[in-house]
Amino acid sequence: MEAYRPTWVEINLKNIEHNCKAAKAFAKENVKVGAVVKANAYGHGAVEVSQACLNAGADYLMVATVGEALELRGRFEVPIMILGWTPEESYDQIIANDIRVAVYDVEEAEKLNAKALQAGKQVIAHLKVDTGMSRLGVQTDAAGLEAAAAIVQMEGIEVEGAFSHFSKADEADKTFVHGQLERFNRFVDELQDRTGKKIAIRHLGASAGIIDLPEAHLDMIRPGIMLYGYQPSTEMHHVADLKPALTWKARLGRVTVLPAGRVIGYNGTYELKQDTLVATVPAGYADGYNRLLSNRGYVLCRGKKLPIIGKVCMDYFMVDATEIPDLKAGDEVILIGEDQGVSITVPEMAVMLKTIEHEVTCDISLRVPRIYV
């Protein structure tokens, strides 16, 4: 990450703490919180966000990759869990650093078990169950139960928990996810009966499940997008009290009047109809400012919306600043956030891009400095 650039994001860690507490408030007192801080905490900064979540009462930190887990293990002693697949080449690292992993494949589990026994340790693992996401996990049929039973009884693996993931919890119709919950609980019950081994921590509910499905809170909840201040979707039956944590700002690189008839940017997709004050913003698609915002998006300045003109470039884009005639180079604009009662929010940007909030914030690249406030 660069030490200074004329574009940066500000992360309000107090808002992260507030959102983590809001997630925790949905669940019963004895339910654990696994804060999902994968993908650099959805672009917000994994180390800083993790500390804020721990301050707010989180019990576990959830990541997607070995590298993410090791980054956090260098700072924190709390349980850190990799939610996805851990390659065999990383087994030594996860054993040495006490990283919890997801297990679901017997052949891979046997290799992990052998590595753990060789090191004289037990790996703490959570059994991943595929209840309908069709991505990773043991199936809930007889063959899946046999595989899970074999894993649970391996000496070098302590199966602390079992988990799955809802595929439609953010939709208004909860029929499918109710089926997932029923399949999950039945499978884990059968596994315990077959092996005589207790699965201490069941977890299934991410942000949408936390808000709309209290019956899915089980032993641990996994807040993700709600930690960063956003509702999982507009179809939710309930609304959480959340505060967005991210603001994206920039200082203008050039402000100049260009004559009518001038075309702007690559391929000249925008032609000035009159003499226009054009301001150049030093951020582009290499920073995560999506090229699909070309000739569609806007930035904020002094309570006004300045529309993007021309295509978003790799490092810059241009806006029509005619409404602010005294604007000058070095003045500040807001790419995401609020200014004098006017806003451009992550959900609004997601709608413009026909995507979800998660992608908007995850796409903000590491060359954009994060400043914590």
Which stretches of residues belong to each language-model region?
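Active-site anion/phosphate-binding pocket segments in diverse small-molecule metabolic enzymes
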Residues: 2-13, 17, 67-68, 86, ...
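Active-site-proximal beta-alpha core segment in soluble small-molecule metabolic enzymes
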Residues: 3, 7-10, 18, 25, ...
